[in-house]
């Protein structure tokens, strides 16, 4: 039996996305909100809403005690964390279970394993899936021996290398080093940044992958020992190490033909080995980085639903949120091993930001909002708008500046591109400054049309006249 009432522990478009599926399944929903989000669409969409604190996320959407109080007050029997905020925090998952509710996501010990990049590397290695060559333990930066070891590893894997904070993400605590003379300084800098941003001073190093592509595999596992790969997503259109456009299937040339299909099969198998190693449960994404030769290396597991999950839904016809709910309720997944993947889907994240000024966030009001030539927040076979705002909303500096996701599907990649471009052409978000025009510039570019782009492409394109 599915849950009677689910508390959605998030905001914006993902909260609305979860609420929509719950409503279709006859599940009552509870929204939480900050003072800044009192009139937000996710609040009005839900059956109940509870104020959990003031605007800053640390005092509201990250306030575990306040959220647990809302859980108790409303009698919800399960918690869906969405993405971001508390979605991958094992302490929160444990607290939900201790409160007598179900956390709709992986087990706390799984969140611990994949929330630590060193542990995740060890899991991948033990599963026979290769991470990017580098150190398998944190570097002892405070000792001469530790620095010497780092230099030896760097010499072995070859320059340039990248120093990373173990607790880092989104490009924070990461620095490229081109020669030995820069290692010691980079180790200290990344360690200091990691400590300040993530309360974790540990660092490690990896080979720097030139012209990298970011490719990920959607996996789904249940409590009955089943694990499935639902295809790959290409996520290489990025700025500041964060995604703007995602698509499925990947248009990378090394995935074409019979050899490409074999490479995909190997990629899916590599992803499944990793999640099976820890007895994974629920939705997850195994992220890989590909070099210009098509060699694929494990990066990490995002132990939650991804922002870009709709592109997988569009090509498979599955509702991943529904699958999350069913798995969390103990149901056995249907056989998804050979689920048909049809056509091509592309998602664009629409942000309140200025691409001409380094993609700097641009908070402000949204007085006029027209989606897709007046079609509204459409949910059709070929087009979806996943929005967290309405006319009269205000993009505040307290949260991520994403306004919405627009997702298009077509029988072919060209058809999907055309559908997405038409949708964006007919979209007005005023007077806000957004990246919508830049997304259309990406869609029109020769590199994107050819599928010949990497993670540096968007920032290069933004500087073109």
Spans of features found by a protein language model:
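ATP-binding N-terminal substructure of ATP-dependent carboxylate-amine bond-forming enzymes
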Residues: 1-127, 136-152, 415
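Post-transcriptional modification and biogenesis factors for structured RNAs
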Residues: 132
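ATP-dependent carboxylate activation and anion-phosphoryl transfer catalytic cores
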Residues: 2, 7-29, 33-35, 49, ...
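Short beta-strand/loop motifs in extracellular/secreted proteins, especially
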Residues: 161
């Amino acid at each position: 039996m599915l849950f009677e009432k689910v508390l959605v522990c998030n905001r914006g478009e993902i909260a609305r996305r979860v609420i929509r599926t719950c409503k279709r399944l006859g599940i009552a929903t509870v929204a939480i909100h900050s003072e800044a989000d009192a009139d937000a669409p996710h609040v009005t969409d839900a059956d109940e809403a509870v104020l959990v604190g003031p605007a800053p996320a640390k005092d509201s959407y990250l306030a575990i005690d306040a959220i647990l109080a809302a859980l108790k007050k409303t009698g919800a029997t399960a918690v869906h964390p969405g993405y971001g905020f508390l979605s991958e925090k094992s302490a929160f998952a444990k607290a939900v279970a201790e409160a007598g509710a179900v956390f709709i996501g992986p087990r706390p010990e799984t969140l611990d394993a994949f929330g630590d990049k060193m542990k995740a590397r060890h899991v991948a290695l033990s599963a026979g899936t290769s991470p990017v060559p580098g150190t398998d333990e944190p570097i002892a930066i405070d000792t001469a021996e530790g620095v010497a070891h780092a230099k030896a590893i760097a010499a072995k894997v070859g320059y340039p290398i990248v120093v990373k904070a173990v607790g880092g993400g989104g490009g924070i605590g990461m620095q490229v080093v081109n020669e030995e003379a820069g290692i010691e300084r980079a180790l200290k800098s990344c360690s200091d940044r990691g400590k300040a941003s993530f309360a974790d001073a540990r660092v490690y190093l990896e080979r720097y992958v030139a012209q990298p592509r970011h490719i990920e595999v959607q996996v789904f596992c249940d409590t009955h020992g089943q694990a499935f790969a639902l295809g790959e997503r290409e996520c290489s259109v990025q700025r500041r190490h964060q995604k703007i456009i995602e698509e499925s299937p990947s248009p990378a040339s090394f995935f074409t033909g019979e050899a490409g299909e074999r490479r995909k099969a190997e990629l899916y198998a590599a992803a499944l080995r990793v999640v099976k190693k820890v007895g994974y449960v629920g939705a997850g994404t195994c992220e890989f980085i590909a070099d210009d030769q098509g060699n694929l290396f494990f990066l990490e597991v995002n132990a939650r639903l991804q922002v870009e999950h709709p592109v997988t839904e569009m090509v498979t016809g599955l509702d991943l949120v529904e699958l999350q709910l069913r798995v969390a309720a103990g149901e056995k997944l249907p056989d998804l091993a050979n689920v048909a993947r049809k056509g091509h889907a592309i998602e664009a994240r629409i942000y309140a930001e200025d691409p001409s000024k380094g993609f700097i966030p641009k908070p402000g009001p949204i007085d006029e909002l027209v989606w897709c030539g007046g079609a509204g927040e459409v949910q059709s076979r070929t087009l979806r708008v996943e929005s967290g705002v309405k006319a009269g909303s205000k993009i505040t500096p307290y949260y991520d500046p994403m306004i919405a996701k627009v997702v298009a599907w077509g029988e072919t990649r060209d058809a999907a591109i055309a559908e997405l471009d038409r949708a964006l052409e007919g979209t007005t978000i005023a007077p806000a400054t957004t990246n919508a025009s830049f997304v259309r510039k990406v869609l029109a570019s020769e590199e994107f049309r050819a599928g010949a782009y990497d993670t540096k492409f968007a920032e290069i394109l933004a500087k073109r006249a």
